[in-house]
Amino acid sequence: MSSIVAENYNSKAVVNLWPDFIDWSKRRQGENGFLKKTLEKNKVNSVFDSCLGDGCDSIYLLKEGFDVTSNDFDLEFIKKAQENARKENVKLNISSFDWRELGRHYDKESFDAVLCLGNSLTYLFCKKDQLNTLRQFYKILKKDGILVIDERNYQYFLDEKDEILKGNFRYSGKFVYCGKKVHAYPIKIEKNRVVMEYSDKNKKNKGNLVLYPFRRNEMKKLLAEAGFKKIQQFSDYKKEFNPDADFYIYVCRK
């Protein structure tokens, strides 16, 4: 993906920190059954996990009986996911396709659900690429299928930039990124670019990611422009809108 910052990919430092940054069991506790319940409510069987990462969601759903196809562009994360799958005694079905070209590899209406979780669309910096990706997700979804996608509350980053860069960064640690051994802080906040630093407690091991900060309602507008008619928004997995939420999750119907 040419529009993705090269330094975001194949970083062993970030991949090695990731398990302690997420904490799989606490992530599941934080979502309180949200993902499984949402898929079951919408009678989902086949799932395209567009951002495999270390396998947290794909492995969980495979163990829950869903038919999962996983995708990732990062070779180091794929290795880590395969390692985790072996530990959990499940077999991953992995592809490494460019999101913007999914229609070349999958037929229209191939999946009941597409997942783009873990704040992953933020790796794309250009609106054209963001929109094209969402349209590709729409294309490979079956009629009445759902896209489940999330984003960090970047409006907070942008509004409180000065305080955050002084070291006063607010994050509950209860949702999505729940580990206590690895911490992440913004070290640069610009209009169209945020740099996050990930480090262990002793700061001996560090890694950075460069991310696009979606403004409030920006992703929601892109989802509508991509063709999704019914878009439900959740704040930290709760229905009401909370301007101080850590994460926003969208369930979008084709």
Regions found by a protein language model. Give the residues of each.
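A short SAM/SAH-binding and catalytic strip from SAM-dependent methyltransferases
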Residues: D112-K128
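C-terminal lobe and adjacent flexible extensions of AdoMet/dcAdoMet transferase-like proteins
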Residues: R216-K254
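Class I SAM-dependent methyltransferase SAM/SAH-binding core
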Residues: C56-L102
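Conserved class I S-adenosyl-L-methionine
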Residues: M1-G53
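A short glycine-rich, Lys/Arg-flanked "PGG" loop and its adjoining helix->strand segment in the class I
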Residues: L131-K143
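SAM-dependent methyltransferase
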Residues: V148-K221
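A short acidic, Gly/Pro-enriched loop at the edge of an enzyme's catalytic core
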Residues: R104-A113
